[in-house]
Amino acid sequence: MLNSAMSVVILAAGKGTRMYSDIPKVLHTLAGKPMVQHVIDAATKLGAAQVHLVYGHGGELLKQTLKDDKLNWVLQAEQLGTGHAMQQAAPFFSDDEDILMLYGDVPLISVETLQRLRDAKPQGGIGLLTVKLDDPSGYGRITRENGKVTGIVEHKDATDEQRQIQEINTGILIANGADLKRWLSKLTNNNAQGEYYITDIIALAYHEGREIAAVHPARISETDGVNNRLQLSRLERIYQAEQAEKLLLSGVMLRDPARFDLRGNLAHGRDVEIDANVIIEGNVTLGHRVKIGAGCIIKNSVIGDDCEISPYSVVEDAHLEAACTIGPFARLRPGAELLAGAHVGNFVEMKKARLGKGSKAGHLTYLGDAEIGDNVNIGAGTITCNYDGANKFKTVIGDDVFVGSDTQLVAPVTVGKGATIAAGTTVTRNVADNELVLSRVPQVHKQGWQRPVKKK
């Protein structure tokens, strides 16, 4: 069916006392992203013309964190219930648009479920998302008459008979803007909590002869809210299990799906293998036949075909061409670039550095602010000394250079093509093509040398 224009209200004013945190509840992260951001993203994908965020506690931190110019910030200075929260947003509703109500602490709600709810909303009525629970204790019950939804009764206000009802309200609903404003104006706080319940609009709509269509989500977990860290951790595992399942079904070999975390977006080729305890953050692309070893962290990086990243390596904001090998225990920091066939071994760190085709830095090396040519060998313990305490300087190494172990390259410095730098050398001046450079203190031998003896 053809949908009307739609705006979304996200309720995010709660303090989250049971989180025992100074951070507003909705800013606690799931899969590396604030819970409320998951909800905002779902609203955006659904095509919301406007997203109204109702906030209260921690408003400044919310604004600093979300930084979304498209959000309409609505202050709820006092938390007097969900109906009261919606009343604060009501002046922004257009009469001819639908209003979808969501919650900042219900992060797993899917676009697909919301679209079905939107499609099911009757003309002039309400679309209501409900679920059936074996133990509905604490939740508002859906009352029906001859199969039709007639209202919602909060648990504290329910009779013993009503508490036997298993169908409960998730709090997510959609209604026309003009209708919603009219119903909101009629809410009272005559209940056990002394609050204004948005759920009371269901009975108001029913008594006007309006239809209420109940829709169930694809998965109950979509409507699970978070009140404490235990609940958040459970939703994290549910989310990660879903992501792992999608990747397995799309051809990625996860050696242990229960020990894999996706905290962003992963694009991948064919025959990718990922071992246990790998974390993917931000936007990551893995080419064909890429292998990621156990315990690696890959963030905002592009990994080319046939690359292999050995265990416990960290790759952040880096770009690897085809057939590169990394680690184990390597660290590629922002700006690291490896051309085809390059190798970075154990305990090597790169930042703002390019390693040319077929070049190798095998062990215990720091390469920062460096441009390294093709077929270069970087010996163990080599350091580009790029920082003088105030400014960074660049090291340039040409093709086919051999850098011996324990070399210090004091930038700014350029090493020409084919040059050889002997082990233990400190390079402070430019080196010409094909030169041999060495700087060593003369070796001294003292026969019969005795070590000092500790004084008694």
Swiss-Prot record:
In which residues is Mg(2+) bound?
Answer: D105, N227
Q: Where is this region: N-acetyltransferase?
A: 251-456
Subcellular location as annotated: Cytoplasm
> Pathway, per Swiss-Prot/TrEMBL?
Nucleotide-sugar biosynthesis; UDP-N-acetyl-alpha-D-glucosamine biosynthesis; N-acetyl-alpha-D-glucosamine 1-phosphate from alpha-D-glucosamine 6-phosphate (route II): step 2/2; Nucleotide-sugar biosynthesis; UDP-N-acetyl-alpha-D-glucosamine biosynthesis; UDP-N-acetyl-alpha-D-glucosamine from N-acetyl-alpha-D-glucosamine 1-phosphate: step 1/1; Bacterial outer membrane biogenesis; LPS lipid A biosynthesis
Specify the domain of life of the species encoding this protein: Bacteria
Annotated segments matching region Pyrophosphorylase? 1-229
Function text: Catalyzes the last two sequential reactions in the de novo biosynthetic pathway for UDP-N-acetylglucosamine (UDP-GlcNAc). The C-terminal domain catalyzes the transfer of acetyl group from acetyl coenzyme A to glucosamine-1-phosphate (GlcN-1-P) to produce N-acetylglucosamine-1-phosphate (GlcNAc-1-P), which is converted into UDP-GlcNAc by the transfer of uridine 5-monophosphate (from uridine 5-triphosphate), a reaction catalyzed by the N-terminal domain.
Q: What is the protein named?
A: Bifunctional protein GlmU
Designated gene of the protein: glmU
